């Protein structure tokens, strides 16, 4: 079976990109901590939006979808699931809520990971919920002509429980001994988890939930206010490319995990930057028109009402719609499309 020893990672020489990302994340985390102490009430809307986005996008990456209205109702627990997709979405909502509320009481062990997986499927009858895989799984690609290619073969079912135990032990050891920088240990753990692919279903969603859990446990709370899952979904191809590069040679312990580390750290930093942008708009106490004007200047290319809502969480939908109408009327924005397909772009 593949051996795991996270102590060897500390001997690696990191390039300026990795070191720069780590330094920038710590700087942004410090700024966020200061803001949370000063203005916690103003950020409640950001939490609500991030929960909805995280639940919607993490499931959508795996082809699990419903309407935006239903997503919002499910996340706010104002309705019950109507079908299998909505059952899976409700399960993700439940796990995410547990992580938000109790991350410091969830140790990184196989037992707790299995419990979280069981909750992920708690709204449906899945006999494999909370159990490691019973049959071999494969990471595949389906091409336009219909042929399927195996890109990576994860560990065999009989190897999986021990491997999951080992990566938890290694992670806890290097973090507990302060032997390895958490922002290196977290992507290494998540990458190993994805290569083990411990479940017959739900590995991608569990990896994203574990990323949030690990970040919270190490004092990086950006995922509570800005959806990391939405960031990953927006750059899904880059995510899969980084994962594929880092998987080469994994079974022999000869993988280069740096592409995945850079990808995940870049995603975390981008979320912190978004947090700073949104806080700047919330903080200024501007009239709705000026808030929407400034938010539109933060967007490159086309954007829709939802994009503005994310940047201006304190504004109601009617205030956003009214401001957009005025900006179109004054010639600052151009409007395209109708209904759900409506989008805008700046003219100057």
Where are these regions (language model features)?
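FIC/Doc superfamily catalytic core
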Residues: 1-348
């Amino acid at each position: 079976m593949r051996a795991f020893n996270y102590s060897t990672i500390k001997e690696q020489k990191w390039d300026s990109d990795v070191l720069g990302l780590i330094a920038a994340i710590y700087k942004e985390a410090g700024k966020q901590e200061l803001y949370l102490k000063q203005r916690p009430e103003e950020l409640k809307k950001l939490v609500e939006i991030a929960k909805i986005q995280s639940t919607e996008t993490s499931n959508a990456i795996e082809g699990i979808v419903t309407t935006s209205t239903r997503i919002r109702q499910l996340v706010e627990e104002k309705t019950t699931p109507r079908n299998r997709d909505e059952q899976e979405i409700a399960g993700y909502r439940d796990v995410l809520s547990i992580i938000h509320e109790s991350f410091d009481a969830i140790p990184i062990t196989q037992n707790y990971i299995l419990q979280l997986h069981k909750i992920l499927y708690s709204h449906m009858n899945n006999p494999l919920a909370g159990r490691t895989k019973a049959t071999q799984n494969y990471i595949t690609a389906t091409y336009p002509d219909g042929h399927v290619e195996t890109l990576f073969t994860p560990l065999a079912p009989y190897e999986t429980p021990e491997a999951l135990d080992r990566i938890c032990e290694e992670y806890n050891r290097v973090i507990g001994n302060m032997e390895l920088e958490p922002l290196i240990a977290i992507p290494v753990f998540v990458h190993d988890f994805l290569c083990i692919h411990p479940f017959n279903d739900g590995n991608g969603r569990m990896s994203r939930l574990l990323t949030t859990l690990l970040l919270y446990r190490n004092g990086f709370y950006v995922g509570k206010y800005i959806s990391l899952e939405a960031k990953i979904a927006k750059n899904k191809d880059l995510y899969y490319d980084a994962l594929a590069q880092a998987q080469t040679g994994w079974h022999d312990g000869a993988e280069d995990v740096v592409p995945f580390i850079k990808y995940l750290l870049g995603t975390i930093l981008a979320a912190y930057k978004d947090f700073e942008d949104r806080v700047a708009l919330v903080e200024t106490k501007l009239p709705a028109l000026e808030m929407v004007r400034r938010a539109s200047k933060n967007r490159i290319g086309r954007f829709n009402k939802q994009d503005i809502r994310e940047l201006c969480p304190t504004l109601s939908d009617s205030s956003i719609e009214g401001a957009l109408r005025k900006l179109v009327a004054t010639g600052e924005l151009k409007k395209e499309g109708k209904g759900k397909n409506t989008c805008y772009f700046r003219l100057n």
